[in-house]
Amino acid sequence: MTQIIDGKALAQKMQSQLAKKVEDLKQEFGIVPGLVVILVGDNPASQVYVRNKERSAIAAGFKSETIRLSESICQEELIKIIHRYNKDESIHGILVQLPLPTHINEKRIILEIDPHKDVDGFHPMNTGHLWSGRPIMVPCTPAGIMEMLSEYQIDLEGKHAVIIGRSNIVGKPMAQLLLDKNATVTLTHSRTRNLSKISSEADVLIVAIGQGHFVTEEYVKEGAVVIDVGMNRDDNGKLIGDVAFEEVSRKASYITPVPGGVGPMTITMLLEQTYQSALRRVSS
């Protein structure tokens, strides 16, 4: 029987535990973890994500600040704002919501964030730590997936893990985290030949390709663990994943739903990394 990996329930559990840790930090050291989210423009999806992050941060006892900027802001002005929060000792996490308007260079903006406050884990210094096997700040979605696999006691050692999607946000860091757990990893993408054949050999299949219901049952072997990272809208505006849930769930041993799977855990790991950043500040 297929087991649903309930990311929403796990996120609630972890955020409840996090709220207690935040209160303990406040009582013992007088420090409240501070998170600032910088939103440029009025992308509707980004606005929803930012609201959810802000709500979760406040509920867990964080200091939460959202900076909403005009889409027309120039790159240098945005960098000045980032530098201000780099120096602000009450802020332990800085997140610039992506995507940014086309006139702003995302790579340059990521470089300007203090890597010790880069709770998205995108700064090259944090990428280097991850690839050298000494992760500090890890991209939140892969980190959340690893927590889910651990919670459901899914053993990765010696397993064949296939990732569909090679982004710097999910696919590439996910590959390294799985390698660190001694999985054998195949990283694929939209131009991979014989993709359905490769994915159907996976013990663990992680799908982050950004196409609604891309993965159907022929992509999945019997008993596989299927993690769906996708968030898409169908023709009726319904939120769907990259995996055709109904048909794939008939073959999978474990599967994440959309919504209620990976999404809530991404926010949870953002908060966890902000807390850890505050804790490192105390230690130093």
Curated annotation (Swiss-Prot):
The keyword NAD does not apply. InterPro entries: Aminoacid_DH-like_N_sf, NAD(P)-bd_dom_sf, THF_DH/CycHdrlase, THF_DH/CycHdrlase_cat_dom, THF_DH/CycHdrlase_CS, THF_DH/CycHdrlase_NAD-bd_dom. GO terms for cellular component: cytosol. Its EC number is 1.5.1.5, 3.5.4.9. Keywords: Amino-acid biosynthesis, Histidine biosynthesis, Hydrolase, Methionine biosynthesis, Multifunctional enzyme, NADP, One-carbon metabolism, Oxidoreductase, Purine biosynthesis. GO terms for biological process: L-histidine biosynthetic process; methionine biosynthetic process; purine nucleotide biosynthetic process; tetrahydrofolate interconversion. CDD domains: NAD_bind_m-THF_DH_Cyclohyd. NADP(+) binds at G165, R166, S167, S190. One of its GO terms (molecular function) is methylenetetrahydrofolate dehydrogenase (NADP+) activity. Pathway: One-carbon metabolism; tetrahydrofolate interconversion. Belongs to the tetrahydrofolate dehydrogenase/cyclohydrolase family. PANTHER family: C-1-TETRAHYDROFOLATE SYNTHASE, CYTOPLASMIC, C-1-TETRAHYDROFOLATE SYNTHASE, CYTOPLASMIC-RELATED. This is Bifunctional protein FolD. It comes from Streptococcus uberis (strain ATCC BAA-854 / 0140J).
